[in-house]
Amino acid sequence: MNNYKIRINFSHHYTRHILVALKTTGVDIEHDPNIKPEFIYVNDELVGYIAWWDSLKFTPANLKDMAENDFKIIFKFHYSPNVIDYSIYGKYEDRIVPCGLWRTWETEDINYKWNKHNIMTRPRPIDVTAQMRHINSSKNWYPWSHIRYQLKNLAKAMNDRGFNTSFKMIGRKAYEKKLLDTNTAFIWSATSYLGWKVCEFLEQGVIMITEPLGKDYPLCNDVVLEDDVHCVFCNDPNQFEAVAKQLLADPVRVNRIRKNILDLWQSKLTQNHVGRWYLKKIIETYEVMQSQMKNINKEKELMESI
């Protein structure tokens, strides 16, 4: 890996976590503000691009960059092939790599230490959290806004009925610590699908109750969340309380799912694993480019010799 120098300009806080993860690999990674934002170069050759915007489609800014350049790989946040037919993007359809919205508390807090045993065995006095944004800058509420608001109110009502729930937004550090005391979480997709919540819950061992995802929402490192393995699916917001009660009443099931979650994080989603995954995709793409160029040059030499 010493033969590669990677220059990137990940200009947004969404991608800061990926930059930090890449730097754990030991490869020569330079954050270069002099190249265009979101571009990825290997040995001074343009290889890839990262599309992090909150959209299942590519944005106008993405499309402009894609039209003006020939990226060989595009890392796409919020990739959802069952919602969007990506063949509309022509040559780029087979170059898109889904990568979800990944982050770790390690990037946010230098003092954070992930302790699997502690996370697995610690008391969790909070039954349910529903601390999620339910509106954005739009004046008109989207369907997801109403559902998220409904779930937040449901958590509040459960609190009034004797459950210990969290539903008010709080500061990031307080939220991080509170997740460690939380058993389950209500979450529903928004404009940007599930966003950061997935990794926040997985890293802290919180069991998501969410609408069905399946292969419609692949995360980075080829991770696909499975029902009753890593989370619990429910397609009816009106049934979330019943699902939570059933789950909380079954500690064996809770422990099984939590162990699966933490095993998944440890084996696929740590900083180092994610960094190596991104690096592998980038380097493999670069090597294919080099091989293709060698073949082109050989054909040219052959034609010139005839």
Enumerate the language-model features and the residues they cover.
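C-terminal "capping" alpha-helix adjacent to the active site of nucleotide-linked donor transferases
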Residues: 237-253
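Nucleotide-sugar donor-binding catalytic core of glycosyltransferases
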Residues: 1-227, 267, 272-276, 280, ...
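Catalytic phosphate/metal-binding cores of nucleic-acid and nucleotide-processing enzymes, i.e., regions
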Residues: 206, 216, 237-240, 261
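A short, well-ordered alpha-helix in the C-terminal region of glycosyltransferases
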Residues: 253-268
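Short beta->alpha junction loops/turns
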Residues: 191, 236-237
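Short, hydrophobic alpha-helical segments
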Residues: 248-252, 282-293
